[in-house]
């Protein structure tokens, strides 16, 4: 039980951490493309 909870697969961490990162990058590029990011 401790082995499964203590050792999380890297693809699970990458997926959970990757989704918000991709979302933030998408919002950043969309904002810079539409002109909102140029003022930052």
UniProtKB/Swiss-Prot annotation:
Organism name: Olimarabidopsis pumila (Dwarf rocket)
Function, as annotated: One of the components of the core complex of photosystem II (PSII). PSII is a light-driven water:plastoquinone oxidoreductase that uses light energy to abstract electrons from H(2)O, generating O(2) and a proton gradient subsequently used for ATP formation. It consists of a core antenna complex that captures photons, and an electron transfer chain that converts photonic excitation into a charge separation.
Protein name from the UniProt record: Photosystem II reaction center protein J
UniProt membrane topology term: Single-pass membrane protein
Subunit structure: PSII is composed of 1 copy each of membrane proteins PsbA, PsbB, PsbC, PsbD, PsbE, PsbF, PsbH, PsbI, PsbJ, PsbK, PsbL, PsbM, PsbT, PsbX, PsbY, PsbZ, Psb30/Ycf12, at least 3 peripheral proteins of the oxygen-evolving complex and a large number of cofactors. It forms dimeric complexes.
Family: Belongs to the PsbJ family.
GO biological process, one term: photosynthesis
Top-rank lineage group of the source organism: Eukaryota
Keyword field contains Transmembrane helix: yes
GO cellular component: chloroplast thylakoid membrane; photosystem II reaction center
Alphabetic keyword roster: Chloroplast, Membrane, Photosynthesis, Photosystem II, Plastid, Reaction center, Thylakoid, Transmembrane, Transmembrane helix
Pfam families: PsbJ
Residue intervals passing through the bilayer: 8-28
Localization annotation: Plastid, Chloroplast thylakoid membrane
């Amino acid at each position: 039980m401790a082995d499964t909870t203590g050792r999380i697969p890297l693809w699970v961490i990458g997926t959970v951490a990757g989704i918000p990162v991709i979302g933030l990058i998408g919002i950043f590029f969309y904002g810079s493309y539409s002109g909102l990011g140029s003022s930052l």
